[in-house]
Amino acid sequence: MASLSLKNICKVYPNGFEAVKDFNLEIADQEFIIFVGPSGCGKSTTLRMIAGLEDISSGELKIGDRVVNDVEPKDRDIAMVFQNYALYPHMSVYDNMAFGLKLRKVPKDEIDKMVKEAAKILDLTALLDRKPKALSGGQRQRVAMGRAIVRNPKVFLMDEPLSNLDAKLRVQMRIEIAKLHQRLGTTIIYVTHDQTEAITLGDRIVVMKDGVIQQVDTPQNLYEKPANLFVAGFMGSPQMNFLDAVVEVQGDAASLKVAGKSIPLPPAKAKKVIEGGYDGKTVTFGIRPEDVYDSEMFIETAKCVFESTIKVYELLGAEVYLYFDLAEFPLTARVDSRTTARPGDTVKFAFDVEKIHIFDKETEQVITN
């Protein structure tokens, strides 16, 4: 296994387009790291530079203690799993998994041992004689992972490996990948645009936008303490609600003026906006859907209560999404499925002020979480 070090990594194409800009990251041995972001953010390009499939324009890449900028992909001791399984259709599962080892002229008895061990780990033993066309999508992806496992690489690189699977299979394969990481203790770098995959799988997540790292942190910290407006909106589904608010300061206290009402800020949050000189300024106020309440018990103790008319009601089993407007801003509340609110109803709701996020309107950087 191995650690990785990426220092000031840049990728600039001949036409001048900067796909990755000054990328800096230290990845620990056996860490499961996720690159996440929208299409075109540079996450797959970064993975391909690590693999050696893209040239690095500038910067230094180390795998372990070895600088590998100019090392051929086959000599980097890595294995890749792609979105497309890339299996040989005329070969059995066994031969697909063994193919790379045969090319490296590994002794036949060692190949047999390595393939069967990988098949056991991935629950493929009963399928070793089958051709890819006789397998389900999930089974094919497990074969692709098995082909990577038998190489016993220092680092696994996975580029959106679950994108071609249906929703149920994606959940199953997420669990399989998590188990695989625990069992093998490998370093894994995993690219996805799906923030649910990122949150459930990663030890740490690298959020990217326009080739630039926005934040690197644990899943919980990314969700609870986003560094900026982009991260706050990207991580979480439904996404965080955003409204414009004006800061009002009175002595050591501060509040946010939203839709004609004042929301008092907790002391720690008030201190941050006062020290930042935001009195009288417009800021962006963020609140996650699960921190918007319609329950009478919460509203009775809330310091600021709003009213709005429900536009859309979505039942998702144990919970309901309520969609409504506050002033000109669309909001979503994630509430208990026992709610009596329905479209057309005017309901009272309140925010959990301890969970408020405040962002600078111009820089979009967080002021306080």
Residue ranges of model-derived segments:
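Short coil-to-beta microelement around the adenine-binding A-loop and adjacent beta1/P-loop entry
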Residues: G16-E18
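The feature captures the beta-strand-to-loop junction immediately N-terminal to the Walker
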Residues: V36-P38
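Helix-to-loop junction immediately C-terminal to a conserved catalytic motif
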Residues: A51
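ABC ATPase nucleotide-binding domains
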Residues: P73-F230, F234
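Glycine/charge-rich catalytic "coupling/switch" loops of P-loop NTPases
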Residues: A253-I310, T340-N369
